[in-house]
Amino acid sequence: SEVGTGYHQTVYSNQNSDWGSQKELIEFINRMHAANTKVVADIVINHAGGKSWCEFFPQNFGEYGTFEPDASWIAQSDEVNSNPEAGDCKGKATGPEDGGYNMQDNYASARDWAHAKPEVQEMMKAYLKWMKNVIGFDGWRYDYAQGFKGKYIDMYNSASENYFSVVEFWNGDMNNIKSYLNDVNWNTLAFDFSTKYSAIQGIADGDYTKCKGSGLLGAGLSKFAVTFVDSHDTYFGCQGGRDNNDEIGGCGKSMEDYNKDRVLGANAFILSMPGVPCVFYPHWAKYKDAIGKMVLARKAAGVHSESQVSDEAGNGFYKATITGHHGSVRLLLGPNSGFNNIPQGYKLAYKGGNFAMYYTSTQAEVPVLSI
């Protein structure tokens, strides 16, 4: 991004930002790679920024191509064509649409790219190839994926040959997420908002029955699920003036000490279950010791994205055994789960005020957590 943090992108081929220079970014990625760590970029390709509705910038991706976008690259249903503040730009967005634009909600704060236009497709493919092969990123977190058709995610991933991608398709209905994944030809993972709004909310409310069969995990699609407790959007939802109150424990309250068991119990859930768990950094920063022990237990047991789960739930409890490559994890959530009783043959990973995570492992060497 030319300025700021990169959400309202103007020059995709300029990775200087408020966080540092492009040179510093490349150096950082190289250090992460030296530590055997993959690096994922937050990709904003739904919409374009600018100081005016008509402002566009050339995009220079070196060997991958140069591009000169203009208003004809913006979807014709974009608000630029109807907004009275658009001035001379009004009516100039003529980009083709194919039913992908505005699938769920128009992004009103910026102009939306017409991904049905071949020139836009070529620019985005060049951008991702450049980000991977020149800047050094390994994968993508696609922002606001509901703004364009899933087939373009498949197109862009196939072109860039990235190691990993996850889409932010913000929808609490598992069937809608599944439908989007099908549109992507199953060539990505998705943030599992359906598990966030069922199991994670159930843990916060003390309704542990919602943990059983929740979201993509319960639908047998854990391989495609990136599970999470909170994100920058849910955590800052009401603080940022948004109308959601999705933060675990209530808006602005998850980091309060009285919500510790809610936060850690929910993290124990995602770190025990199949799928690809994503720990929210503020949770990690505050509870590093506890969450670190859970991560090590998962690694020791060899729990993976397609691990099998045997579970039961009822009034005040959720009990699950998750089978890994090297052992298993036993998760006991809720006051009636018997969490204080160590299962035979298991070791304690971490115990809170109303939950515990235990594990077994056949590994000779104990996994080491390096952050």
What are these regions (language model features)?
Residues 2-7, 13, 29-37, 41, ...:
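Active-site-proximal helices and loops of the catalytic beta/alpha 8
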Residues 15-18, 117-119, 255-257:
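Short, flexible loop segments at the rims of nucleotide/cofactor-binding pockets, characterized by
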Residues 1-107, 113, 146-167, 172:
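Acidic/aromatic-lined carbohydrate-recognition and catalytic surfaces
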Residues 112-127:
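Alpha-helical scaffold elements lining the catalytic groove of polysaccharide deacetylases
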Residues 20, 119-123, 262:
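Short secondary-structure boundary/capping elements
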